[in-house]
């Protein structure tokens, strides 16, 4: 989990004993170590937001072959392909004048796709999604010529520093410096990691968004003061319920419904991947044997919203809202067991993935899979 190295370390004594480290690739990692409880657990923390731009730099235009392809992959995983041509051809970018002119032609073609917005400066084309998701990145592949059509991608926000500072009470506060690209410019944010209260059940107090601001007062539909997130697609929790993402414009957003308690910030995903399943079989262990998980029970504590599946591309969302819950407000956190059909295939690993994509609490106590093993 330390990959190629750690550039900085610090220790948090309370409320949990965690050794924090900053990796040289800008990820924050932690090692929770509680000897008396026999707890030794590594964890990674990828912050909301993005750093870097998706760009294409055009060079040596005269030798870009006819039919060279560029593939843009949106934050939701869907792709769009653009193709070059050495003569005027509808639906392709032309390579007939110069590096700069070729870049302009490429920009014009990408701009014609409603999913993207492109700008050009000299021979560099910068691309953004028109309506990006609040999580995920825009990436580029130059399938046939990565030299003459060089690219850069959007990437995760970069953690540059971490520090633990004692507070007036018994807990310690963890502070980080996060580097993001905001509205085309590099910005650094000084933020602290919220110490989660596991006993809190008031939906309006939940804070599971990065660089977030809160509003509490009379019912409103406009939330302002968001200049630090200008141009960003933000996650929203309104009156304890999830709300469709919005893009910050002129430092504000407009809600779909009036609300009295609102949290607005950069969304992130929380993902759990189990180790390879080690269960019994008729002939010893199930390790290395073909198996299929067909149902799983997930035991939760004060949680709302969870997906489970065999891979991140095949997840099943577990329902929490019932006919007894009012439709115009958030639902209370759930404690107990949720059983769900597991859409798994036969394989030898038996991995289980659990994911939270909403700004809501998720505490997993245990997972109980039911499976069939072929001996």
Where are the predicted features?
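Beta-sheet repeat architectures centered on beta-propellers
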Residues: 1-51, 55, 146-375
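Extended, beta-strand-rich, solvent-exposed assembly scaffolds of outer structural proteins
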Residues: 51-151, 256-257
């Amino acid at each position: 989990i330390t990959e190629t190295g750690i550039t900085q370390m610090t220790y948090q004594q309370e409320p949990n004993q965690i050794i924090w480290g900053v990796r040289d690739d800008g990820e924050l990692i932690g090692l929770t170590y509680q000897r008396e409880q026999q707890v030794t657990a590594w964890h990674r923390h990828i912050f909301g937001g993005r750093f870097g731009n998706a760009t294409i730099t055009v060079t040596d235009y005269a030798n870009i072959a006819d039919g060279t392809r560029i593939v843009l992959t949106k934050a939701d995983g869907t792709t769009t392909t653009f193709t070059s041509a050495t003569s005027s051809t509808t639906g392709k970018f032309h390579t007939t004048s110069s590096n700069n002119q070729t870049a302009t032609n490429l920009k014009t073609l990408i701009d014609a796709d409603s999913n993207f917005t492109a700008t050009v400066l000299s021979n560099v084309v910068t691309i953004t999604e028109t309506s990006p998701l609040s999580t995920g990145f825009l990436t580029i592949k130059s399938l046939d010529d990565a030299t003459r059509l060089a690219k850069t991608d959007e990437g995760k926000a970069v953690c540059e520093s971490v520090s633990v500072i004692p507070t007036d009470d018994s807990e310690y506060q963890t502070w980080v410096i996060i580097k993001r690209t905001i509205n085309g410019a590099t910005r650094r944010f000084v933020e602290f990691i919220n110490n989660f209260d596991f006993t809190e059940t008031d939906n309006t107090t939940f804070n599971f968004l990065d660089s977030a601001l809160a509003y509490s007062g009379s019912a409103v539909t406009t939330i302002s003061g968001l200049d630090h997130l200008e141009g960003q697609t933000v996650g929203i929790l309104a009156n304890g319920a999830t709300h469709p993402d919005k893009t910050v414009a002129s430092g504000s957003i407009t809600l779909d419904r009036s609300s009295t308690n609102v949290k607005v910030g950069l969304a992130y995903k929380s993902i759990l991947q189990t180790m390879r399943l080690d269960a019994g079989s008729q002939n010893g262990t199930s390790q290395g044997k073909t198996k299929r998980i067909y149902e799983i029970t997930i035991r939760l504590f004060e949680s709302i919203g969870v997906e489970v599946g065999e891979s991140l591309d095949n997840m099943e969302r577990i329902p929490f809202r019932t006919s007894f819950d009012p439709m115009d407000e958030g639902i209370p956190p759930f404690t107990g067991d949720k059983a769900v059909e597991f859409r798994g295939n036969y394989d030898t690993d038996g991995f289980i993935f659990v994911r939270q994509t909403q700004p809501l609490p998720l505490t997993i106590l245990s997972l109980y899979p039911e499976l069939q093993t072929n001996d």
